[in-house]
Amino acid sequence: MKKILSIFIVVFLFAVGCGQQKEEKKETKADNKNQAITIKHAEGETKLDKPAKKVVVLEWVYSEDLLALGVQPVGMADIKNYNKWVNTKTKPSKDVVDVGTRQQPNLEEISRLKPDLIITASFRGKAIKNELEQIAPTVMFDPSTSNNDHFAEMTETFKQIAKAVGKEEEGKKVLADMDKAFADAKAKIEKADLKDKNIAMAQAFTAKNVPTFRILTDNSLALQVTKKLGLTNTFEAGKSEPDGFKQTTVESLQSVQDSNFIYIVADEDNIFDTQLKGNPAWEELKFKKENKMYKLKGDTWIFGGPESATSLATQVADVMTAKK
C-alpha cells in the first residue's frame, strides 16, 4: 500500500510540475508579446512600448508585408490601385480605411484612426516626417539600402515589420514559403533543360505618348529573384541604379536582343500592339523575330514583398517552360 501511495505522490508531483511549466511558458509568451521593442529602419531606430496593433501603411510593399503576416492595417494608402496592380493572394479587408494616395496621404484621416504605428517609405515620408511623428511612432524604409540590393533590403524590412507587430514566427514561415517557391521554380526550369538562360526584363508602358521601357538592373528585386532561379541578366546599366531600373526607349533594347525578353505590360496600355506595331526598331529585334518573348501579368508587382517575389518566380518559371 505504501508503495502504491508513493507512486501516486510521484505521479501527482510530476503532473503539477508539468502544469506549472506550461503556465510559465504561456506567461513568458504573453510577456514577450507585451515587451518593448526597437525597430531599425532607414531613418534610425524607433522604440515601441509593445508590438503595434493598429497600423497605418502608406506604401504598397509594406501593406503587402503586413497582409502576408495576417495583419490587416487600420489605414492604407491607395487601396483601389493596390488591388489593381499588386498580384498577391492576400488582400485588404473592406474594413481598412483608405488614407489618400501614397504621394499625398490624408494626415487628418490618419490622425482620426489613432494608430500605434505608421509605416512608409523614406523617399516619400521625409517631407512629412514631423507631422507623421506627431500622430504616432513612424518607421521609414528605403529599398536602396543593404548595398542597393533590393531583395536583401526587402527581406530585412519584412523581418523588422514582423517584429513591429509581434509576428516574427509568422514572418519566418512566410519567408520559408517564399524560398520553397523559388526552389520549385528553379527545379521546373532545370527540368525543362533550356538551351538559353540569358534574360532581360522590363516594364513597358506609355509615358508622354512615347513607348517607354524600364529595363531592370541587377540590384532590382526581380532580377535577384530570377538569379535564384538560375537565369542570367544580360542588361548592363553601366552604373548602379538606386531604383533598380533604367528608363529608356525601344532603341536601347538592341543591346539585349540576343536574350530572352521577359516583360510586364498592362492590357489597357499594351504598347506592343499599338505604338510599336510596325516600328522597324522593334520589329527587327532578334528576340522579337525569334519569338523569345515572355509576357508576365500586368499586375505583377516588381517592387513588392515576399508574396510578390513568390508570384514573380512562379510566373517566370511557367512562361519560360511553356511550349510555344
From Swiss-Prot:
CDD domains: FhuD (cd01146). Residues 1-17 form the signal peptide. GO terms for cellular component: outer membrane-bounded periplasmic space; plasma membrane. A lipid is attached at residue 18 (S-diacylglycerol cysteine). It is a lipid-anchor. InterPro entries: ABC_transptr_periplasmic_BD (IPR002491), Bact_iron-sidero_bind (IPR051313). A lipid is attached at residue 18 (N-palmitoyl cysteine). Residues 54-324 form the Fe/B12 periplasmic-binding domain. Its main location: membrane. It comes from the Bacteria. Can probably form at least three ABC transporter complexes, composed of two ATP-binding proteins (FpuC or FpuD), two transmembrane proteins (FpuB) and a solute-binding protein (FpuA), or composed of two ATP-binding proteins (FatE), two transmembrane proteins (FatC and FatD) and a solute-binding protein (FpuA). Part of an ABC transporter complex involved in ferric-petrobactin uptake. Belongs to the bacterial solute-binding protein 8 family. This is Petrobactin-binding protein FpuA. The gene is fpuA.
